[in-house]
Regions:
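N-terminal small/polar loop signature for handling phosphorylated ligands or for N-terminal nucleophile
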Residues: 36, 40, 48-112, 200-259
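An N-terminal, well-structured beta->alpha segment
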Residues: 1-68, 72-73, 152-185
Length: 460
């Protein structure tokens, strides 16, 4: 089955059977549930929703299905077209809209698409609201508008530019200093909407852009998740072009990775580390990441004399914790930068601007910058379970075994050792337990993972 319904939206593969894949009927049903929930929540006579999409091949089809379903409910739709996840998040409050829908399956391959749901702040809907929307969809509890009360459709293609203006206006972004450096940068946007947004931002900052896979046609030239094994082309190109560094974004531009001037991975985990280092050097405040993110961020927070706290995995959880501790920057170790000065959402445009500001101020190469940060190495693994095995029982047994260590149970089980940690999480969509480890060397991280895999398998 390739249809996953969750509190943050619905995602699946295009084609196939209803309720097994993301078919037109599933898209309509879920859009109707969201629209019905919004109407009930707002209590307003006229409800407005912003819709934007990445460049996936199925994007236009899904967009038409979703927007005309909302219009059928009597909801006005602002179609901002080819866009990015953070751009839609910024557009919702600018439009004074009641919600937003982002049509993207993020880093999933081209056959996938999804509806991601926003509230009137341009933030992902809460757990409670997501459950209410799922219930409406399950019960087909929709009431469509009569012919005289259908919604209206408007198109507005200016929001990427408006988003860029907001990024450039941030007090910690220093366009003049960046322009003086005359950086040369290679951009891999995996032929999605980052190919529109990132070069446009860089050009405004006086950066010479070398485009690689920047045609927003939805034909991804490699696996779109920005991991080392997928990024051989840009690593090679950075060296060939003698570029200062490379920028990689996923299809909806909420994840950001850098390539050093030597053609090596800066490390997705270190995107947030570098941006936080810059921000904390200018303003003191707390920082937040998720439990599976590198300890390097905690080290940077300590260096600047501020507090670090960890949230459960997932953007909604990180944002909730950031608000609780009034963090000035946060995110996830997969290259997601959340900078509340602009909005509470992962935003690669903000990340690029802060990173360039850091480079302009510090001088030196990107490779030298990376080497200035604490060195940690991660290992990511999983163990397969049968349907009969209860993952919660395994995690409970491991918690009891390591009760003498520092443990956290807000999201699975995380065990912190002196120079390493392990995070065990059950999947909500398949019968597996994920094992994340981090240590001072790759060998130690792999060995720690292997040890925990063996210990859990002994319990099965």
């Amino acid at each position: 089955m390739s249809l996953i319904k969750s509190i943050s939206g619905i995602r699946g593969t295009i084609g196939g059977k209803v309720d097994e894949n993301l078919t037109p009927i599933d898209a309509v049903k879920f859009a109707a549930a969201y629209g019905s929930w919004l109407k009930g929540q707002s209590g307003k006579e006229h409800v407005k929703v912003v819709i934007g999409r990445d460049a996936r091949i199925s994007g236009e089809m899904i967009q038409n299905l979703v927007q005309y379903t909302l219009i059928g409910l009597g909801i006005d739709v602002v179609n901002i077209g080819l866009s990015t996840t953070p751009t839609v998040e910024v557009a919702v409050p600018m439009e004074k809209a009641d919600g937003g829908i982002i049509l993207t399956a993020s880093h999933n391959p081209k056959e996938w698409n999804a509806l991601k749901l926003l509230n009137n702040k341009g933030e992902f809907v809460s757990d409670q609201d997501g459950k209410a929307i799922l219930k409406i969809a399950q019960e087909n509890d929709f009431s469509f508008a009569t012919v005289d009360h259908l919604g209206k459709l408007t198109h507005d293609n200016q929001y990427i530019d408006l988003h860029i203006e907001k990024v450039l206006a941030l007090p910690l972004v220093v366009p003049e200093a960046i322009q003086k450096k005359k950086f040369r940068v290679v951009v891999d946007a995996v032929n999605s909407t980052g190919g529109i947004a990132i070069p446009r931002l860089l050009e405004r900052l006086g950066v010479e852009v070398i485009k690689l896979y920047c045609e927003p046609n939805g034909h991804f030239p490699h696996n779109p998740e920005p991991l080392k094994e997928h990024l051989g082309d840009i690593c090679k190109r950075v060296v060939e072009e003698k570029a200062d560094f490379g920028i990689v974004v996923d299809p909806d531009v909420d994840r950001l990775a850098f390539i050093t001037n030597k053609g090596e991975m800066f490390g997705e985990e270190y995107t947030l580390v570098a941006c936080a280092d810059y921000v904390l050097g200018k303003a003191k405040g707390n920082v937040v990441s998720n439990l599976s993110s590198s300890r390097a961020l905690r080290d940077i927070a300590q260096k600047h004399g501020v507090s670090y706290s960890a949230a459960a995995v997932g953007e909604v959880n990180v944002v909730t914790e950031m608000k609780r501790v009034e963090a000035i920057i946060g995110g996830e170790g997969n290259g997601g930068i959340i900078y509340p000065e602009l909005h509470y959402g992962r935003d690669a445009l903000v990340g690029v601007a802060l990173f360039l500001s850091l480079l302009a101020e510090r001088g030196g190469s990107v490779q030298q910058l990376r080497e200035s940060y604490p060195a940690y190495f991660m290992s990511k693994n999983k163990i397969q379970l049968t349907e009969q095995i209860n993952p919660d029982q395994i995690l409970k047994a491991m918690e009891q075994k390591y009760a003498h260590e520092q443990t956290t149970t807000i999201d699975g089980l995380k065990i912190d050792f002196a120079d390493s940690w392990v995070h065990l999480r059950k999947s909500n969509t398949e019968p597996i337990i994920r094992i994340y480890t981090e240590a001072k060397s790759q060998k130690e991280a792999d060995a720690l993972a292997h040890r925990f895999i063996e210990e859990m398998q002994a319990l099965i």
